[in-house]
Design a protein with these regions (language model features):
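Catalytic/regulatory signature loops of cyclic-dinucleotide turnover enzymes
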Residues: 148-150, 174-195
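Catalytic-site or vestigial catalytic-site microsegments of nucleotide-handling domains
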Residues: 6-16
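Short, solvent-exposed loop/turn segments at secondary-structure junctions
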Residues: 14, 152, 197-200
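Core nucleotidyl-transferase/polymerase catalytic module
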Residues: 3
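Catalytic core of nucleotidyl cyclases, primarily class III adenylyl/guanylyl cyclases
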Residues: 6, 44-87, 105-171
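Short, His- and charge-rich active-site/binding loops that engage polyanionic ligands
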Residues: 98, 102
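Intrinsically disordered, glycine/charged-rich C-terminal tails and inter-domain linkers
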Residues: 188-322
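Active-site-proximal alpha-helical element of nucleotidyl cyclase-like catalytic domains
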Residues: 23-63, 90, 94-97
């Protein structure tokens, strides 16, 4: 038994995707596995300690070097680490990269009426001389989950796969149970954590977090925190290039807005993107306030929201930041 941070993250919308088109659901899994493979390669070939001193902090934040266990099952993943601070930063970066992997499709949709619509171009398996062009959809890869800290026990239970016996790896303990319970407490692609995790964080990690603004059924604060994971893409070391850094805001906001517009008539889905958009805006404000350019980002945000939303929509979605 040891003390670890444990994250439980789940793909939003995966169940509906499996029901409607299993092949597109498999594509969602393939995308985040591709990102994981890339991070695994980087940690082996270019560990953050090998970078020059000014870049080591950035390299560490964008790696997965703190991931000790990464255990996927269907659309869910358990991840564990002994280093809470690095873990939260790197988990946030992983979630950010998962969405950005195909976000360009939604930012510049082939069919504005459906930003997930695209096509697959490849070689015809039955005739290698022919190119095939198949219409398809690419659902966004967005995670929601929880992180807890506490006792974790690593076990190796017996299992079967394709009638073959094998020994699998498993995690159990209080931290695992608490992480799973947090996953569905709020709407949107958000990663929550409790005060036990917060107590373990250094100042850098705390900067990328906030108290969850939602209240419980009695109107009381939930008493939980969340990772401002859209903030992970900004290079805070580039203060002099703050105008260029605004591109990251639009890299996230534009595809999220187009997806919200597409699902706007479906309230159950739309609210997921409304919470996502608010998280993107809050994260940008946090970064630019830190860099000393708060007035700049507030102007850009106000300008963007005014051009995209009605006054009622702005008040409903962004009441916590405007």
């Amino acid at each position: 038994m040891s003390q670890k941070a444990v994250a439980y993250i789940d793909l939003l919308g995966f169940s509906n995707c499996v029901k409607n088109n299993p092949e597109e659901a498999i594509m969602m899994l393939t995308h985040f596995n591709t990102i994981l493979s890339s991070l695994n390669f980087e940690r082996e070939v270019h560990p953050s300690a090998n970078y020059i001193a000014p870049l080591q902090s950035l390299a560490r934040r964008t790696s997965n070097e703190s991931f000790e266990h990464f255990m996927p099952f269907s659309d869910s993943v358990f991840i564990a680490s002994s280093n809470c601070s690095d873990f939260l930063l790197q988990l946030g970066n992983f979630v950010k990269d998962a969405f950005l992997f195909n976000a360009r499709i939604y930012a510049h949709p082939e069919n504005p009426a459906d930003p997930t619509a695209t096509h697959y171009i490849g070689v015809d398996p039955s005739n290698p001389n022919d190119v095939i062009d198949i219409p398809c959809h690419q659902p966004p890869v967005l995670f929601r989950g929880g992180v807890s800290y506490g006792d974790v026990i690593e076990t190796t239970p017996a299992a079967l796969f394709n009638n073959q016996r094998y020994i699998c790896n498993n995690l159990m303990g209080e931290a695992v149970v608490r992480a799973v319970k947090m996953e569905g407490l709020v709407k949107g692609p958000r990663i929550l954590f409790n005060d036990r995790v917060y107590e373990q964080l250094n100042a850098e990690a705390k900067f990328y977090c906030r108290l969850v603004p939602e209240k419980d059924e009695n109107g009381q604060p939930l008493g939980l925190y969340e990772i401002l994971w859209p903030a992970m893409g900004y290079i805070t070391e580039n203060r002099e290039l703050f105008v260029q850094e605004i591109s990251h805001f639009y890299d996230l906001f534009t595809p999220a807005y187009n997806l919200w517009s597409f699902y706007k008539s479906n309230k159950d889905v739309a609210i997921q993107y409304e919470r996502f958009l608010e998280l993107i805006v809050t994260s940008a404000i946090r970064i630019y306030d830190y860099m000393g350019y708060g007035d700049y980002i507030h102007h850009k945000v106000a300008e963007t929201l005014k051009s995209k939303f009605t006054e009622e929509e702005r008040l409903n979605i962004f009441e916590m930041v405007i």
